[in-house]
A protein has these predicted regions:
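Beta-strand-rich modules
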Residues: 405-426
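A domain-start/cap signature at the N-terminus of enzymes
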Residues: 18-58, 89, 141-156, 160, ...
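Recognizes extended acidic, P/S/T-rich segments that occur
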Residues: 359-411
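The feature captures the conserved acid-bearing segment of alpha/beta-hydrolase catalytic domains
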Residues: 165-249
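Pro/Thr/Ser/Gly-rich low-complexity, intrinsically disordered linker/stalk tracts
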Residues: 317-356, 410, 425-435
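Alpha/beta-hydrolase-fold serine-hydrolase catalytic core, especially in secreted/extracellular enzymes
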Residues: 228-230, 237-334
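Alpha/beta-hydrolase active-site loop
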Residues: 108-135
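Cap/lid segment of the alpha/beta-hydrolase catalytic domain
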Residues: 87, 93-118
């Protein structure tokens, strides 16, 4: 009997408030006691953009080890910023959440050879049927992994290199574990050296007793792959330790460039990396230049896919974030509904691809009456509408794109506007409605 426990295709208690478009599918896999199968349960949540006719790829946002990380991973597929990337390229967004408590060995799942690669593929097969998009089962992947998620991604790279568009290793890889003999050393196939990848530890991890392995593991993985000519980069985060910080502001442009470069117009066979557009940089510096003019050793240099990512990289290694000079697009589908003497506003909006979504400003008759959230808080990075956790995921409760104006005069006529504010504070044009 299949271990897939099929959930409702629409997870109403989570999805209904978001008003961000798309649909959510969820499937749970029960733990197994069979040899070679996953001994932990896992929930996979998939988001599909509205109007997608052919799913070109799957962007996987994989959390790290421990109960807190697993809980953080529950909201990954609901992230409006990562959804904007997926929507641009006709991709699905997948957020796994393993059912691991703090007493259980993380390697039960973060080493995919212990069964998590099988459940991952089973979930994709299920989603392909449930969504009536058979191409999901064979679509290529972008793999983002934090800590144990990076461990998982680095081994998946050796198992399914032909399926992987690009990889982002945030503070994690399996290299140290296989070098120490703690796990079986994988055989790295030649195809693994053709995948664009970026290693991204926190600079404060380097001399940290607990997290130093995240630094050495990612840096040594970078050197191993770069020595073989792989398109690999290294970008330390100057502000952080093991938390993800504002790394998304470089990870998303990196994936954006790789998706544009490698996704085919049809089919699942990936296009090769275009090395003519590459920029290179000496590792642990803050200067990059076109590969054609680079004077250092290219086999030791940081590889960057194009000029835009190179400029973002140069900023990030100095500041831990990336700036944005373009305002977001306006919200849409603003609807006004009278409710018990008040006026309910609902709308939809996409996150700004460059810097995400910080807040909404509500205006009535040309005057600001509210902000959502009232005060955005950034505990681990820039303040965002959905919050930002240690794990680069939205924080619960997930906010609604909804406002109830209780101060309006009943029966009066008013014009309302909603303005989106992106992650750096730039405002969109107004979305307006009158009643």
């Amino acid at each position: 009997m299949s271990r897939l426990l099929f959930a409702l295709t629409i997870v109403v208690f989570i999805v209904a408030p978001l008003k961000a478009g798309g649909r959510y599918l969820e499937v749970k896999v029960a733990p197994s006691k069979e040899p070679g199968e996953l001994q932990l349960g896992v929930t996979y949540t998939l988001w599909l953009p509205d109007g997608v006719t052919h799913v070109r790829g799957v962007i996987v946002h994989q959390h790290g080890c421990g109960a807190g990380a697993c809980k953080g991973g529950e909201t990954a597929a609901y992230d409006l910023h990562w959804q904007a990337l997926a929507k641009k390229h006709g991709c699905a967004l997948l957020g796994p959440s393993y059912h691991q408590d703090d007493k259980q060995n993380c390697r039960l799942w973060c080493d995919p050879r212990n069964g998590s690669h099988k459940t991952f593929l089973q979930a994709l097969d299920h989603f392909a049927k449930e969504a009536r998009h058979p191409e999901i089962a064979t679509a290529p992947w972008c793999l983002w992994g934090h800590s144990g998620g990076g461990f998982w991604a680095s081994l998946m790279q050796t198992m399914y290199p032909e399926r992987i568009i690009a990889l982002w290793f945030r503070s994690g890889s399996a290299l140290n574990a296989w070098e120490k003999g703690e796990i079986e050393r994988p055989k790295i196939p030649d195809a693994a050296y053709d995948i664009p990848m970026m290693m991204n530890p926190g600079a404060k991890e380097k001399d940290d007793k607990r997290f130093a392995g995240a630094w050495t593991g990612t840096y040594n993985l970078f050197k191993l792959y770069r020595a073989k000519g792989a398109p690999a980069g290294f970008v330390p985060d100057p502000r952080t330790s093991h938390e993800c910080g504002d790394s998304r502001y470089l990870a998303i442009p990196f994936f954006d460039a790789c998706l544009a470069m490698r996704l085919p117009e049809s089919g699942a066979k990936l296009r090769p990396v275009n090395r003519k557009t590459a920029w290179l940089a000496t590792a642990l510096t803050d200067k990059a230049e076109p590969a054609a003019t680079f004077k250092g050793d290219p086999d030791e240099a940081v590889w960057l896919p194009n000029e835009a990512v190179a400029k973002a990289w140069m900023e990030y290694v100095k500041t831990g974030a990336v700036s944005d000079k373009s305002p977001p697009i306006a919200p849409r589908a603003l609807k006004l509904t009278p409710i018990d003497g008040a006026m309910e506003l609902t709308w939809d909006a996409d996150a700004d691809l460059e810097s995400g979504l910080q807040a909404f400003i509500i205006e009535r008759d040309g005057k600001e009456i509210a902000r959502l959230p009232e005060k955005a808080v950034g505990r681990f990075g820039r303040p965002l509408f959905q919050g930002l956790s240690y794990h680069d995921t939205p924080e619960r409760p997930l906010p609604a794109m909804r406002y109830l104006d209780k101060t309006v005069t009943p029966g009066g006529k008013h014009r309302y506007a909603v303005i989106a504010v992106n992650g750096v504070g730039l405002r969109s044009p107004r979305a307006e409605a009158a009643r």
